[in-house]
Amino acid sequence: MNDNSIEHIQECYIEDYNQWAYMIDKSLKECLGETDTSVISQLIQINKSNADGPLAGVPYAVKDLFDVCGFPSRNSSVLPEFNACATKNSAIIERMSQLGATCVAKTQMNEFAYGLTGENPHFGNCRHPLLKNCLSGGSSSGSAYLVAADYLPLSFGTDTGGSIRLPAAWCGVYGIR
């Protein structure tokens, strides 16, 4: 029987995340950034009020530049001024929530989105999901990684000088600027 209920989809996502978190290959943890299953469960509970939306139950991630209320937007930096938790959501988070989707992760990136490789001296380099000796591209590296590895159906990044297009091309997924 194929159960496509919101609850089933979300349970499968949490089950999959638990498997990813313990992978020997640490590149996924480096790409995910600030997320754990209790956070995912909390975000799912918050979003159940929009269970009728066209994207109900769809998990997605955002680059660590986007504000998610209650979570720090670190810009993949360790500077203390970036440790404060956001007091409101970015517009894309609000809109996706209205549509019923659930933000389940903030992804790794080049520090301050300044780079095209996926390298980060503080949180580790975001490796290519299939070619372990290669990088995923940047600066929206974690977003491309999660979609290319088929962990999430979509993820949001930012693009000024190729920061979506390069990692999408390097990882073999579609990236829309």
Task: Give the residues covered by each predicted segment.
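Short, well-ordered alpha-helical
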Residues: 1-85, 113-115
